[in-house]
Regions:
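C-terminal transmembrane helix and the adjacent membrane-cytosol boundary/short C-terminal tail
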Residues: 149, 195-203, 244-277
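Membrane-water interface segments at the C-terminal ends of transmembrane alpha-helices
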Residues: 20-40, 75, 114-138, 147, ...
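Generic hydrophobic transmembrane alpha-helix motif, especially the helices
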Residues: 58, 62, 68, 92, ...
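Glycine-rich helix-loop "coupling/hinge" segments at transmembrane-helix boundaries
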Residues: 131-134, 146, 161-162, 211-253, ...
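Hydrophobic alpha-helical transmembrane segments of membrane transport/permease proteins
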Residues: 6, 21, 25, 29-64, ...
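Transmembrane alpha-helix signature in integral membrane proteins
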Residues: 68-103
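Transmembrane alpha-helical segments of polytopic membrane transport and secretion proteins
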Residues: 1-24, 263-277
Length: 277
């Protein structure tokens, strides 16, 4: 699809436009966090512990006296950073396994797909938590754990598409022109798999945000004292009946990010896969 046509269809999709606006807002906040945050997110004020939202602290403070607005702003960085790392690992790995197994078939397909089935047979979140428990807490380890449990779905999707197109006239014509091997896989087969993979990724990112928050909630995400939405909810759970806003505010941020990715995924599906309309 030409890029200008893609942009035209994207502008006509309200869901995609809303999702892009929400994602752009999150990226803007993450990039300019030092200028947007009113104070240092790790600065502790013992005299202002568990302070309610007010003129001094717009969203209140946590149990250590840290400004919640500043920590909420800085929390976008590990959230989007983890999403970016998972995307960089998951999409190439899943497409590589799926394209190789679908195109070559035979023993290559059997080995790759059996390994894929083994990974898919395990509960995704439990497997991710187990990986992080073995590797240790941290942003990179969390991204690796989530990526290792996410790529099989992309591999199976790419494999099914390649099997459907393997004997098409399009690929037969390319092979008759002498286009084979890596050139065929990258130049002709990969572009056929990308649209559906991008749509699936956009829809999966909402779940990845929730899984990342779950890791932070259990203390397996970003290392303290780095601001992280899941860890902020865990801190707020201890005083949720009296100072409910400490957990509700980062929960609202997670909801906003998930909604933005879901809307973007729905819009991209309408644009890149019109047969779903």
């Amino acid at each position: 699809m030409p890029f200008y046509l893609f942009l035209r269809r994207l502008r006509r999709s309200p869901a995609a436009v809303c999702g892009l606006i929400g994602l752009a807002l999150l990226v803007f906040i993450a990039l300019f966090a030092p200028w947007l945050a009113p104070v240092d997110p790790n600065w502790q004020d013992a005299a202002a512990r568990l302070e309610a939202p007010g003129a001094r602290h717009w969203l209140g403070t946590d149990s250590y006296g840290r400004d919640l607005l500043s920590r909420l702003i800085y929390g976008t960085r590990p959230a989007l950073g983890l999403v970016a790392l998972v995307t960089v690992i998951t999409l190439p790995a899943g497409l590589l396994v799926g394209i190789l197994s679908g195109y070559y078939g035979g023993w290559v397909e059997r080995i790759l797909m059996r390994f894929t089935d083994v990974v898919m047979s395990m509960p995704r979140l439990i497997l991710a938590f187990a990986f992080v428990a073995m590797l240790g807490p941290g942003l990179v380890n969390g991204a690796l754990a989530l990526a290792l449990t996410t790529w099989p779905a992309y591999a199976r999707q790419a494999r099914s598409e390649i099997q459907r197109l393997r004997h098409s006239d399009y690929l037969a014509a390319a092979e008759m022109m002498g286009i084979r091997g890596l050139r065929l896989l990258v130049g002709h087969i990969l572009p056929l798999c990308l649209p559906s993979a991008i749509v699936r990724l956009a829809l999966d990112l909402a779940g990845i945000i929730l899984a990342a928050a779950g890791l932070g909630f259990l203390g397996l995400g970003a290392r303290p004292p780095m601001a992280e939405w899941g860890a902020m909810i865990a801190d707020g759970m201890q005083v949720i009946f009296d100072q409910w806003w400490i957990a509700a505010i980062p929960g609202g941020a997670i909801l906003f990010a998930s909604l933005a990715f879901n809307l973007l995924g729905d819009g991209l599906r309408d644009v890149l896969e019109p047969q779903h309309d």
